[in-house]
């Protein structure tokens, strides 16, 4: 397996030349465009890795699956999905268009920015510090990584430049989707996107979902139903507005982030973490997508 991963990383590294690192958030543009790495964690405890698997990066939108889990644990499935839908939007992740033009004013799903901001507003706590502290501790628990922390520079960059996110949040407040303090919800959201980890971190997160919400030590954190909800939304909405194409090409539940990460889940088998900050036009890791496509074909991982 290790040799296969090494071979696939080298084969697909050429695709990094065809994309670009995210540059609309200060600090993200400092990533090495040519970087590509992968980490695989199996349910029976084996670990395999190749390439730039140890490079730290901010998980960005991969955090949306973590905040969704915590929001459901805090409030229950019925409440969360009364505020946020489950349908693909077909629009870019930062689009505001359907919020106003759709007959239903709630965000289409929790994987687009508007939906994730609404989800962040549902995390329990007396203020944004307590809410984010709970979220970070929950992330450490399910990734089994106590070194997870906030990249403060990127958080400030997110907060200083996220004007479209501010506009979405205030619109959601006006529609009654966000019930609490708007700025607290945004602070939690910007901070969760700025959590820093490695390919191993998101590989372990993938393994947690592959094991239906059970940690390596056997402790159950999510119900089986909750784990299924998260994995289903990863398939239908996890790769932004190329989720359908990715499902056809790769066929495993995955969630990407503009920091270059992709967290993938092979149910009952393994979690996969990929890092490649050179992005395609949809905001997904370009070489990372090709790498996962090859790995899925080689190991027959497609769930369909």
Swiss-Prot record:
Catalysed reaction, written as an equation: L-glutamine + H2O = L-glutamate + NH4(+)
EC number: 3.5.1.2
Entry's Gene Ontology BP terms: glutamate biosynthetic process; glutamine catabolic process
UniProt xrefs under Pfam families: Glutaminase
Binding annotation for substrate: 61, 113, 158, 165, 189, 240, 258
Matches recorded under InterPro entries: Beta-lactam/transpept-like, Glutaminase
GO MF annotation list: glutaminase activity
Keywords: Hydrolase
Family, per entry: Belongs to the glutaminase family.
Assembly behavior: Homotetramer.
Protein name per the record: Glutaminase
């Amino acid at each position: 397996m290790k040799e296969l991963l090494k071979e696939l990383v080298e084969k697909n590294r050429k695709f990094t030349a065809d994309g670009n690192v995210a540059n609309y958030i200060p600090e993200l543009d400092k990533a090495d465009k040519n970087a590509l790495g992968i980490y695989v964690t199996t349910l029976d405890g084996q670990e395999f890795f190749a390439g730039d698997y140890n490079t730290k990066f901010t998980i960005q939108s991969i955090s949306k699956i973590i905040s969704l889990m915590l929001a459901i644990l805090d409030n229950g499935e019925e409440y969360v999905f009364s505020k946020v839908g489950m349908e693909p939007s077909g629009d870019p992740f930062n689009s505001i268009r359907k919020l106003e033009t759709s007959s239903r004013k709630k965000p289409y799903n929790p994987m687009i920015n508007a939906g994730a901001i609404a989800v962040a507003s549902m995390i329990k706590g007396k203020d944004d510090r307590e809410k984010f502290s709970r979220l970070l501790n929950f992330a450490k628990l399910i990734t089994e990584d106590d070194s997870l922390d906030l990249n403060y520079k990127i958080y400030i960059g997110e907060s200083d430049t996220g004007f479209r996110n501010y506009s979405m949040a205030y619109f959601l407040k006006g529609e009654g989707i966000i019930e609490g303090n708007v700025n607290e919800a945004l602070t939690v959201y910007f901070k969760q996107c700025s959590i820093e980890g490695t390919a191993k971190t998101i590989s372990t997160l993938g393994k947690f979902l592959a094991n239906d919400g059970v940690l390596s030590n056997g402790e159950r954190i999510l119900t089986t139903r909750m784990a299924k909800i998260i994995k289903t939304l990863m398939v239908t909405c996890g790769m932004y507005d190329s989720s359908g194409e990715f499902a056809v090409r790769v066929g495993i539940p995955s969630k990407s982030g503009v920091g270059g990460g992709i967290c993938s889940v092979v149910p009952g088998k393994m979690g996969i973490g990929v890092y490649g900050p050179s992005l395609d036009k949809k905001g997904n890791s370009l070489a990372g997508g090709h790498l996962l496509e090859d790995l899925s074909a080689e190991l027959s991982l497609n769930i369909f």
